[in-house]
Amino acid sequence: MLSQAWALALLCFLLSLWGSLPAVFLPQEQALSILHRPRRANGFLEELLPGSLERECREELCSFEEAHEIFRNEERTRQFWVSYNDGDQCASSPCQNGGSCEDQLRSYICFCPDGFEGRNCETDKQSQLICANDNGGCEQYCGADPGAGRFCWCHEGYALQADGVSCAPTVEYPCGKIPVLEKRNGSKPQGRIVGGHVCPKGECPWQAMLKLNGALLCGGTLVGPAWVVSAAHCFERLRSRGNLTAVLGEHDLSRVEGPEQERRVAQIIVPKQYVPGQTDHDVALLQLAQPVALGDHVAPLCLPDPDFADQTLAFVRFSAVSGWGQLLERGVTARKLMVVLVPRLLTQDCLQQSRQRPGGPVVTDNMFCAGYSDGSKDACKGDSGGPHATRFRGTWFLTGVVSWGEGCAAAGHFGIYTRVSRYTAWLRQLMGHPPSRQGFFQVPLLP
């Protein structure tokens, strides 16, 4: 009888629940509107159980501290937390060309294999290896081949090395090197004529001094054992070539030091287009009657390839100008060889300066400007014809010839230099095939 009463009570209880079951389930639209997983506090029994990633962070929302309790390792916890809290930024495989991805907070980092670079390793370094980009990485000259891409090559007297970019001398005294410094395992370029410093003995080994009847006439640059480049205007009033000599290895004019070598000038060659009294095409090539002996204090300056000069050397900020010219406007001539570093100006700034001097000399494409607007450092009378030398990756090149200027280091005015790259082909042709006799020659420029 008692068992029947219990059975009846249980049946009544189940029937009462049946009526309330529909309230447990929500309509679809209401269910979708609350698909949000709230964070809830762990119950008493859950706190007694060891940490579970699935229970703590998948079924619920966990904190960094709760995740740390699970991993019990700071680094592993942070790796998990970045992915858990921010999503895996590497899930889309953003790194290209075999790069590996590391997830970061709201970002990622690609570690690129050799030969690739960029945010997503998308850039093939080889495709960026062009002459217009840092000279193609070449130490001296850079060329382009449509099939093989860029290639490096070297000036005469140098050989390309196994790395395909470096140039090593093949002769004892190559152009563009300073022997006394090379033997000291290198040195800093000369520090910053007017406002300049004495060029230490042997550190301007290509500097030539041109003398007329034993007196300083102009400067010049040794570009080969028997060849000196200078300025055409130096020889406008020359009456007799027989009294003109070139001295190499000179340093202190007040005494004989030993390295000096004096040679008679056999030929003076200027462009046929040069007009006396004008400033355009102000360049001259001199052949010595006998070659000088190259050595520690006498070495040539490199005559650069024109493209290299215009596309690479022209963008080197500072270059060296040297000579024995006047130390000040209307001042005394320097006793020791002076050198100064001058900055090169942009062409438009040079042309603007030219337009501000109505009736003055015109700056043409065959020239460039260099110097300081405050007039603190400059070339001066007696420096004419001397070198504007530019250093690139350890080798010096002839980029300009001291031509003209308004005063010496005059404020607001810059020095004007003949742009050697415009005459490289003409100079090389004459050095390879000089006139057959001695004298003064006017030779047309190459078309």
UniProtKB/Swiss-Prot annotation:
Plasma. Keywords: Blood coagulation, Calcium, Cleavage on pair of basic residues, Disulfide bond, EGF-like domain, Gamma-carboxyglutamic acid, Glycoprotein, Hemostasis, Hydrolase, Protease, Repeat, Secreted, Serine protease, Signal, Zymogen. GO terms for molecular function: calcium ion binding; serine-type endopeptidase activity. Residues 1-23 form the signal peptide. Residues 24-40 form a propeptide. The keyword Transcription does not apply. Its EC number is 3.4.21.21. It is an enzyme of class 3 (hydrolase). The active site is at 233 (charge relay system), 282 (charge relay system), 384 (charge relay system). Residues 41-85 form the Gla domain. Residues 86-122, 127-168 form the EGF-like domain. The vitamin K-dependent, enzymatic carboxylation of some glutamate residues allows the modified protein to bind calcium. The record marks 192-193 as: Cleavage. The modification 4-carboxyglutamate is found at residues 46-47, 54, 56, 59-60, 65-66, 69, 74-75. One of its GO terms (biological process) is proteolysis. It catalyses: Selective cleavage of Arg-|-Ile bond in factor X to form factor Xa. It comes from the Eukaryota. Pfam families: EGF, FXa_inhibition, Gla, Trypsin. Glycans are attached at residues 92, 100, 185, 243. Residues 193-432 form the Peptidase S1 domain. InterPro entries: Coagulation_fac-like_Gla_dom, EGF-like_Ca-bd_dom, EGF-like_dom, EGF-type_Asp/Asn_hydroxyl_site, EGF_Ca-bd_CS, GLA-like_dom_SF, GLA_domain, Pept_S1A_FX. Initiates the extrinsic pathway of blood coagulation. Serine protease that circulates in the blood in a zymogen form. Factor VII is converted to factor VIIa by factor Xa, factor XIIa, factor IXa, or thrombin by minor proteolysis. In the presence of tissue factor and calcium ions, factor VIIa then converts factor X to factor Xa by limited proteolysis. Factor VIIa also converts factor IX to factor IXa in the presence of tissue factor and calcium. Heterodimer of a light chain and a heavy chain linked by a disulfide bond. This is Coagulation factor VII. The lineage of its organism: Eukaryota, Metazoa, Chordata, Craniata, Vertebrata. The gene is F7.
